[in-house]
């Protein structure tokens, strides 16, 4: 067991009940182009086209051979683009049940399949895009290989679903997915979980590792740091546990599995719980009648690093397993820093609330202050469990110092890994976008 001592479990109200329920009926789904780092699309579908489940919608011209397929059968009703014609979303109205089918296999055949056959079916179905590289967090090139695949079979994000509850309902598919990954790499598959019992693969190169402690103990970046540190020469891949289930279902049934179980939670949700929905589901439909009255913000993903679900982005992200709802914090409080703060949370224990252990807080979107200078008071060190100097690294991200940031460990990180640093920052800096700029520069300059 690897125990993480530094970090933070955010005490936010609206914790979900760990029981799976059916979510609202969904009539629109979307593929969100900006969720795929560095992707530039070549469109294969137009508005008004009728598409089957599993039919190609667009391909990545910067990553030849990688295609993105429809998670449902229906009609393309919107193709939304932003500045510089960046693809924001391809929206599909759900109609019918036509689908593209693929080869199916018995469970005991999977571990003996040819690696190229597995890879080709993953690519043709669009399931290949569930894999992400580290460094850079991109979809792997179809001719690339790795010595390490990390399965994130746990989730320590605030308000997250318990991975064990979901995996144990799909034991056969999860084991099938692990068997496929064991062939895909030929080297190590690291299944990273918290304490508890999960279905296990019988393949010798599939290892289980237990992580314990506060967030970010459940992030792939944390797991890689302790088990297989990455750099430009040592590239690892990561995949979420629900995508492993989808891999298994694809090969066991020959059909694309687009179900997604998400945590619908937060202080502004009427009945926080786990709900079954579809990959790319409309979050306006999913949260209909689920949210308390008033102005709220719907977030696809974690409250620490999710995406605001509005306009062309109002859909469930492909890598997200949470939908969080917070009240918009537009109210200003006169001399708020001077009050005892019984109902306010502070990482630095500045308020009276720290004497009431176990208290949950109705947090809002307010930043509790305006932008200011980056002040090194030890906050970053409290929440960063990785063996690096966070204050120095974050300073280099602010300054755009590529060489120094790379030396201090930027290549090991993803935006998720800096979510807590952004949350505790006294200067209100957003470190995720800064990290992405540095990583883009490193990749561009080789």
UniProtKB/Swiss-Prot annotation:
The keyword rRNA processing does not apply. GO terms for biological process: sodium ion transport. GO terms for molecular function: oxidoreductase activity, acting on NAD(P)H, quinone or similar compound as acceptor. InterPro entries: NqrA, NQRA_2nd, NqrA_C_domain, NQRA_N. It catalyses: a ubiquinone + n Na(+)(in) + NADH + H(+) = a ubiquinol + n Na(+)(out) + NAD(+). Keywords: Ion transport, NAD, Sodium, Sodium transport, Translocase, Transport, Ubiquinone. Its EC number is 7.2.1.1. It is an enzyme of class 7 (translocase). It comes from the Bacteria. Pfam families: NQRA_2nd, NQRA_N, NQRA_SLBB. Belongs to the NqrA family. NQR complex catalyzes the reduction of ubiquinone-1 to ubiquinol by two successive reactions, coupled with the transport of Na(+) ions from the cytoplasm to the periplasm. NqrA to NqrE are probably involved in the second step, the conversion of ubisemiquinone to ubiquinol. Composed of six subunits; NqrA, NqrB, NqrC, NqrD, NqrE and NqrF. This is Na(+)-translocating NADH-quinone reductase subunit A. It comes from Aliivibrio salmonicida (strain LFI1238). The lineage of its organism: Bacteria, Pseudomonadati, Pseudomonadota, Gammaproteobacteria, Vibrionales.
């Amino acid at each position: 067991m690897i125990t993480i001592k530094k970090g933070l479990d955010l005490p936010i109200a609206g914790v979900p009940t760990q029981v799976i329920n059916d979510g609202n009926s969904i009539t629109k789904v979307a593929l969100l182009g900006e969720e795929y780092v560095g992707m530039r699309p070549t469109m294969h579908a137009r508005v008004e086209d009728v598409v089957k489940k599993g039919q190609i919608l667009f391909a990545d011209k910067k990553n030849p051979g990688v295609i993105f397929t429809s998670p449902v059968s229906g009609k393309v009703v919107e193709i939304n683009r932003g500045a510089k014609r960046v693809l924001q979303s391809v929206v599909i109205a759900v109609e019918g049940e036509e689908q593209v089918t693929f080869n199916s296999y018995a469970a005991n055949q999977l571990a003996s399949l040819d690696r190229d056959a597995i890879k080709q079916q993953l690519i043709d179905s669009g399931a290949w895009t569930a894999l992400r590289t580290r460094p850079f967090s991109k979809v792997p090139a179809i001719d690339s290989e790795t010595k390490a695949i990390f399965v994130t079979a746990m989730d320590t994000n605030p308000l997250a679903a318990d991975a064990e509850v979901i995996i144990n309902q799909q034991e056969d598919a999860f084991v099938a997915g692990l068997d496929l990954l064991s062939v895909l790499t030929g080297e190590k598959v690291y299944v990273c979980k918290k304490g508890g019992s999960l279905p296990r693969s019988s393949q010798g190169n599939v290892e289980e590792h237990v992580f314990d402690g506060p967030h970010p103990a459940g992030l792939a970046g944390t797991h890689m740091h302790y088990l297989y540190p990455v750099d430009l020469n040592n590239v690892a891949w990561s995949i979420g546990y629900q995508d492993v289930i989808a891999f298994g279902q694809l090969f066991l049934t020959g059909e694309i599995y687009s179900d997604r179980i998400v945590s619908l939670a937060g202080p502004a949700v009427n009945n926080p719980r786990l709900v079954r929905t579809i990959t790319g589901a409309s979050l306006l439909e999913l949260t209909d009648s689920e949210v308390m009255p008033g102005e709220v913000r719907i977030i696809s993903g974690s409250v620490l690093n999710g995406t605001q679900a509005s306009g062309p982005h109002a859909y469930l992200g492909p890598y997200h397993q949470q939908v969080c709802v917070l009240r918009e914090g537009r109210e200003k409080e006169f001399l708020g820093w001077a009050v005892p703060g019984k109902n306010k949370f502070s990482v630095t224990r500045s308020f009276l609330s720290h004497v009431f252990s176990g208290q949950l807080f109705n947090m809002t979107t307010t930043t509790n202050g305006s932008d200011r200078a980056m002040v090194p008071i030890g906050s970053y060190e409290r929440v960063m469990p990785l063996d690096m100097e966070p204050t120095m690294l974050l300073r280099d991200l602010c300054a755009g110092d590529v060489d120094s940031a790379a030396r201090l460990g930027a290549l090991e990180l993803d935006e998720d890994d800096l979510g807590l640093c952004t949350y505790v920052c006294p200067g209100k800096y957003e470190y995720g976008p800064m990290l992405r700029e540095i990583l883009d520069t490193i990749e561009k300059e080789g």
